[in-house]
Amino acid sequence: MSFVLSRMAACGGSCKNKVTVSKPVWDFLSKETPARLARLREEHRVSILIDGETSDIYVLQLSPQGPPPAPPNGLYLARKALKGLLKEAEKELKKAQRQGELMGCLALGGGGEHPELHRPGPPPLRAAPLLPPGARGLPPPPPPLPPPLPPRLREDAEEQETTCPICLGEIQNAKTLEKCRHSFCEGCITRALQVKKACPMCGRFYGQLVGNQPQNGRMLVSKDATLLLPSYEKYGTIVIQYVFPPGVQGAEHPNPGVRYPGTTRVAYLPDCPEGNKVLTLFRKAFDQRLTFTIGTSMTTGRPNVITWNDIHHKTSCTGGPQLFGYPDPTYLTRVQEELRAKGITDD
């Protein structure tokens, strides 16, 4: 088993608080733009430590930092922000490398002590062709094609395409994932997907996750044009009602054979295009038994009850985020990220 796979297995298959990054990219980010890393740590209240390494890769671990309580879904959002920052750093590093290649080519071209002697001069003047009276000139020729990539950059790009990101060796029996088009050794990606059904490169989810929500529940949807949510006053409101009768816990629940009480939950979405998109995703999550689970209530401390399962719903029309209501400008975006983490997307 490769180092990357062993790290994934060691963190229970979820790796929710770990990120792998190539050493050159991490060194570039931490040395050239440390302020951006410091800002990410401060905004998301996390520490970022090197948890392991190979000759080419660091495994970074994110941990909550600062006084409790930690923000909801904080590690997931911090990990996503860090991956975005690393992607930007990788682009900047490649740009710097290209500029270095160009300067090296100019130096090899004979810069010497008087580089101005080697600069290309203006093109020679040419006599314009004689045209008959009234004739129009031909359109200018198309611009020349850009020069090909320097050999080293071309080799780097080809090496990336033929190197497996998991074992870091040459790809054997290449398998390309359908949605994100990342390629791996067939054996490597087969084992990786057994640990977690997501692309090790981008985190794109594959397969269908099924939860342990009680199967006897119903999701009822209605629309109220007279009920207006703050910040969405020009739209009506989608009212979602989740209804569960009492039942007995099954084998997939914490205490099989123990009874749980019934419950009814109500949630609200704006009846706008994005709100209806979230409604469609909520239906998928409910059908896959991911919206609720059975456990201990976070508000009452009562065990063996039906509880929310980390897909946040607005259970109040007003009051803002503190009272699980509106206005909350980023809620629809955040909840789609939570759904995406469970493999619920609109494609």
From Swiss-Prot:
InterPro entries: Deltex_C, Deltex_C_sf, Deltex_fam, Znf_RING, Znf_RING/FYVE/PHD, Znf_RING_CS. Its EC number is 2.3.2.27. Keywords: Cytoplasm, Metal-binding, Notch signaling pathway, Transferase, Ubl conjugation pathway, Zinc, Zinc-finger. The keyword Disulfide bond does not apply. The keyword Oxidoreductase does not apply. Residues 120-151 have a biased composition (Pro residues). Strongly expressed in testis and brain. Weakly expressed in kidney. A zinc finger (RING-type) spans 164-205. Residues 111-157 are annotated as: Disordered. It is found in: Cytoplasm. Pathway: Protein modification; protein ubiquitination. SMART domains: RING. One of its GO terms (biological process) is protein ubiquitination. Pfam families: DTC, zf-C3HC4_2. GO terms for cellular component: cytoplasm. It catalyses: S-ubiquitinyl-[E2 ubiquitin-conjugating enzyme]-L-cysteine + [acceptor protein]-L-lysine = [E2 ubiquitin-conjugating enzyme]-L-cysteine + N(6)-ubiquitinyl-[acceptor protein]-L-lysine. CDD domains: Deltex_C, RING-HC_DTX3. It is an enzyme of class 2 (transferase). One of its GO terms (molecular function) is transferase activity. PANTHER family: DELTEX-RELATED. Regulator of Notch signaling, a signaling pathway involved in cell-cell communications that regulates a broad spectrum of cell-fate determinations. Probably acts both as a positive and negative regulator of Notch, depending on the developmental and cell context. Functions as a ubiquitin ligase protein in vitro, suggesting that it may regulate the Notch pathway via some ubiquitin ligase activity. Belongs to the Deltex family. Homodimer. May form a heterodimer with other members of the Deltex family. Interacts with NOTCH1. This is Probable E3 ubiquitin-protein ligase DTX3. It comes from Mus musculus.
